[in-house]
């Protein structure tokens, strides 16, 4: 039985405009176990979904998210006629799905005030606490989340090696590590992390050979732009 979760990175972003409702809905339709997405705050305090601090790469507009109101942001095309969604839109869609929702707080470049508290309030509002894991490259932010509510699951993102990652996560008080997948391609590292009771959700895995290897190693979740490919890998391994 394969227990590795299939987590759609920015939705089904390999085929549809990333971090749009279209990408999220397509990920759910093809059978993903969860969605990973990215949160920023607008000038008027609305939590919105976008990977970058600016809208230049993903829309037909330009400038920093923090300098726009939410209404102003909705004027831009994020691909296929889609708009930049609010967290409310995504949570309203996900509230009855019983799927994982990985909310990455994008506060490692711009230290948005109250992003942690505002995100937690939305988790409560939509009754999604048991479905959500909050992650960030800003590990101090994850400690702040735990201070607000120790029962909310947190994941530490990292793209370069951490000494004794399992012990580090335990010391920080996190539930999971979210490493760049190439950092945990050996059984010893996986075992060390799991020995400390820490979950491992790796990013961003888009090739079937790596997906299979990581499943064999026992990671808990794989974050991918192509949840359709990962679904195929999991089904083939399950059929063996």
Question: Model-flagged regions — what are they?
Answer:
Residues 1-240:
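Phosphate-group recognition and catalysis centered on beta-loop-alpha active-site segments
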């Amino acid at each position: 039985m394969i227990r590795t979760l299939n987590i759609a990175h920015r939705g089904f972003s390999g085929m549809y405009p990333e971090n749009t409702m279209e990408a999220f809905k397509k990920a759910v339709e093809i059978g993903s176990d969860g969605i990973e997405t990215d949160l920023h705050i607008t000038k008027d305090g609305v939590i919105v979904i976008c990977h970058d601090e600016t809208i230049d790469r993903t829309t037909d507009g330009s400038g920093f998210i923090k300098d726009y109101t939410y209404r102003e942001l909705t004027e831009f095309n994020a691909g296929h006629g889609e708009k930049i969604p609010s967290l409310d839109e995504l949570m309203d869609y996900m509230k009855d799905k019983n799927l994982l929702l990985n909310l990455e707080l994008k506060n490692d470049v711009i230290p948005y005030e109250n992003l942690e508290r505002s995100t937690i309030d939305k988790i409560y509002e939509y009754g999604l606490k048991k479905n959500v894991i909050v992650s960030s490259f800003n590990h101090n932010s994850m400690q702040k989340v735990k201070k607000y509510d120790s029962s909310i699951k947190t994941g530490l993102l990292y793209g370069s090696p951490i000494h004794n990652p399992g012990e580090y996560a335990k010391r920080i008080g996190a539930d999971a590590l979210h490493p760049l997948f190439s950092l945990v391609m050996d059984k010893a590292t996986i075992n060390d992390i799991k020995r400390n009771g820490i979950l491992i959700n790796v990013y961003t895995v888009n090739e079937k050979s790596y997906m299979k290897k990581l499943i064999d190693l026992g990671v808990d979740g794989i974050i991918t732009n192509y949840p359709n490919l990962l679904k195929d890998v999991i089904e083939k391994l399950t059929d063996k």
